[in-house]
């Protein structure tokens, strides 16, 4: 698969989707995108900047949701054009697909909406690359059907169906907790789509703080290393210069100053994993 100007797949180095959870301000977006571009360029990591114009599934109705679609898309367009990086954002409603697809390089669908057929089809029919997050309630093999819905819609819209990615972000484990079953990364290859691992939402504690979600960011490196050792096409990690002050998902965000060291270790591990191939394919 080729997207955003680079090749994506297990035969290539992992690419990175990263940025603050939500667009808090124009200044934060530009500062974070610029810093991430510097880091990833030095390490040779293909990079897509991510931030949301609206967080439609916050725990509390009083929580900060974002700057809205108009201002948010303007900031993302300016980041893309002025910083010089591809941009990704999530859409939450079918009506948002067309205006968002006109601006961003890749769409992302929230995990909660992975079974909403009309929504998934609309995203895929835009013919933009679409990163479909697996629901916390879904078995990894069920993503085969989700991906097929999207692929069919893309083909019907005149594409070849190769614009779909699938993303693991953990599975519900009782109340207010998630676990990551690393087998799912291999199982989700059965979709025929590149597999992305979301290392920050996987350490989220949904609703764990009552009016907001908690998180255990200290386990982001642990799960990211495990995913890279399994073999993934891409990594998703939210980051913030000061997670304690982040307006959304701060408890599971990677401090921006720690991204270089984390990514350096992951690049080395990715090289080893992909150089040696995937012996599990011979076990079937």
From Swiss-Prot:
Keywords: Cytoplasm, Lipopolysaccharide biosynthesis, Transferase. SUPFAM superfamilies: Aldolase (SSF51569). Its EC number is 2.5.1.55. GO terms for cellular component: cytoplasm. It is found in: Cytoplasm. Gene3D superfamilies: Aldolase class I. This is 2-dehydro-3-deoxyphosphooctonate aldolase. GO terms for molecular function: 3-deoxy-8-phosphooctulonate synthase activity. HAMAP family: KDO8P_synth. Belongs to the KdsA family. The gene is kdsA.
């Amino acid at each position: 698969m080729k997207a955003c100007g680079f090749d994506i797949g297990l035969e290539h180095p992992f690419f990175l989707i990263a940025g603050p959870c939500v667009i808090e301000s124009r200044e934060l977006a530009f500062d974070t995108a610029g810093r991430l571009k510097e880091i990833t360029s030095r390490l040779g990591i293909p990079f897509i900047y991510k931030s949301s114009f609206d967080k439609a599934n916050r725990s509390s109705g009083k929580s900060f949701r974002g700057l809205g679609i108009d201002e948010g898309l303007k900031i993302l367009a300016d980041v893309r054009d002025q910083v010089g990086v591809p941009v990704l954002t999530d859409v939450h409603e079918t009506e948002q697909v067309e205006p968002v697809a006109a601006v961003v390089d890749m769409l992302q669908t929230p995990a909660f909406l992975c079974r909403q057929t009309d929504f998934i089809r609309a995203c895929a029919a835009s013919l933009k690359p679409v990163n479909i997050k697996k629901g916390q309630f879904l078995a990894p093999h069920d993503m085969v059907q989700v991906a097929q819905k999207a692929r069919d819609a893309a083909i019907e819209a005149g594409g070849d169906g190769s614009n779909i990615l699938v993303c693991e972000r953990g599975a519900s484990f009782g109340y207010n907790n998630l676990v990551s079953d690393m087998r799912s990364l291999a199982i989700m290859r059965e979709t025929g789509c590149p597999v992305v691992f979301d290392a920050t939402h996987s350490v989220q504690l949904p609703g764990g703080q009552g009016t907001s979600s908690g998180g255990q960011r200290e386990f982001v490196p642990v799960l990211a290393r495990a995913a890279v050792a399994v073999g993934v096409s891409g990594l998703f990690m939210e980051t913030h210069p000061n997670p304690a002050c982040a307006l959304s998902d701060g408890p599971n965000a990677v401090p921006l100053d720690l991204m270089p060291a984390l990514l350096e270790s992951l690049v080395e591990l990715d090289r080893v994993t992909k150089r040696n191939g995937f012996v599990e394919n011979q076990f079937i």
